[in-house]
Amino acid sequence: VDERGQWWNATERLIHEGILFFFKSNLYRAADGRFFIRSEFGDRTETGWLRAVRGFPIFADRALVEPERGVVRLVLDNGLILERRGEQLSVGDADLVWTDLLPSEQHPALGERSVPVRLRPGAMSSLAAFLEEDGEHWALNLGGEKQTLAEKIPDFTSDPGR
């Protein structure tokens, strides 16, 4: 996965939506930080390790803001829907908003570390009316409650020696 979140197989960019959906739906992260895809075909199981992940492998296509509940529901491009409070969202470089897909939110829960998920511009635009910046921090104002976003750079590194 390159810096722009595009998936590659050697020198060929993967563009088939069905294949990308399958990979993203079965993407996990090991304790050492390496990303892997787990495939099950009947009673056969196969694990494929990604050589390099340099950017966000999964994206939130839409954000549904529920101010009365104080949450944002994120619709991911792998079919999952995550519910987040502002504190569970992070702001990285260039005011990029992202969150962690936790192993417990994946089914089956095979991973041991979270997978970073970036909000696409369409999802970000849904947050615009609720986002505030005070010169130091970004916050979501949901139902009169100010929820400060974490300031954190996403980690794509792996440590096989761990």
Each predicted region: which residue ranges?
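Long, non-globular segments of proteins
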Residues: 1-162
